[in-house]
Amino acid sequence: MTDTTTPVILSAVRTPIGRYLGGLAPLPAPRLGAVVIREAVRRAGVEPTAVDEVIMGNVLQGGVGQAPARQAAIHAGLPGTIPALTINKVCGSGLKAVMLAAQAIRAGDEQCIVAGGMESMSNAPHYVYGMRAGIKAGNSQLVDGMIHDGLWDSFSNTHMGNLAEYTARKSGVSREDQDRFAAASHQKAVAALEACRFKAETVPVEVAGKKGVTVVDKDEGPRKDSSLEALAALQPSFEKGGSVTAGNAPGLNDGASALVVTSLAFARAHGLTPLARITAYATGGGEPKDLFFAPIVAVRNLLAKAGSAIGDYDLIEANEAFAVQALADGRALGWDWDRVNVNGGAIALGHPIGASGARVLTTLLYALQDRKKTRGLATLCLGGGNAVALSVETM
């Protein structure tokens, strides 16, 4: 690749992650997206007019309105001449947006792109099917759009949590292992919050309410009181006698994250120093019911493309869709657990599904910077049986 076709990341930022119906709930996804787009462009040091395109992931689009990414771009103050694309690759949406940006730069089509993801699970609507034709008699039923469009496997007609139980049986991951992993996720996230290690990667969000404007400036999910004993006391959430609980799964969340991706030539021409170079990316998949094993395939595909081994990466950020998923994938790939999710993961921080891919990458970039490391790998599984992976090298 030449400098013109080498993709680099100039900036990365995320909102704090809000709890379900928490501090960020009054803001729809495009408004959350606008916050991070505006801040990512500011941090990158580029003029808004220099942006060629905005690409944002968003999964729960019901009721959001036309062109969510376009809404976010306009609300961020970008000129109306800049096109925008909304993508839905379920939990991989935010990272796939960055991959699409890198592809556009490698193809020579564009030089400066804002990419990321946004989600407000709190604002997902309920649906009433059949109302358009009219319900002539009998009862109608409300369908939870958040679950139907975000957390429900359409192939097996079952909740993601049931497939997590299937994953636990297939991989042999025990309840105790899941709870221990979840407790560690909270402990690491709480330690990171107390040490202000998330401060650099987050932008405070102003939320207008009846009592005036409040500012959300910290992640709402990490719990100091999380412990192995407390988690062990929770009942299974999806199957009687199962091992997956509300404690070893992520929450329902709101948040957004965005990155400015440019060519190396663009960065140099504007006197800007990139955070990192995008070195490789890949997707992978299997049967829909095996979605939680899909990162194994995606990461192996990336390693083959990059000619690297898993041990070559100083830090790994793997989305914690469930503790069982993270454990099954890590064991199969031979991760050094001391390098994985060093500041906690989605079980503690939260999983705003369309935003998580960009959030994971953003957290990885700042963790590499904070620990003075060089090479990083980000990966997520996603509903339908696929996964995404992307690697970076700091500059």
In which residue ranges do the predicted regions lie?
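Flexible glycine-/small-residue-enriched beta->alpha junction loops
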Residues: C112-Y166
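Condensing-enzyme catalytic core mediating Claisen C-C bond formation in acyl metabolism
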Residues: M1-L27, L228-F293, V297, T362-T363, ...
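Conserved catalytic cysteine-centered active-site region
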Residues: N58-C112, F155-H159, D225-G251, A332-R359, ...
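Beta-strand segments within the central parallel beta-sheet cores of soluble alpha/beta enzyme folds
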Residues: T49-G57, P83-N88, I113-M118, D177-A184, ...
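N-terminal extracellular/periplasmic Venus flytrap/periplasmic-binding protein-like
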Residues: R14-T15, P26-L27, L32-V35, R43, ...
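Active-site pocket-lining segment
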Residues: L163-E165, E201-V203, G209, T279-A348
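Conserved active-site "lid/cap" helical segment
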Residues: T2-V59, G63-V64, P68-A72, A76, ...
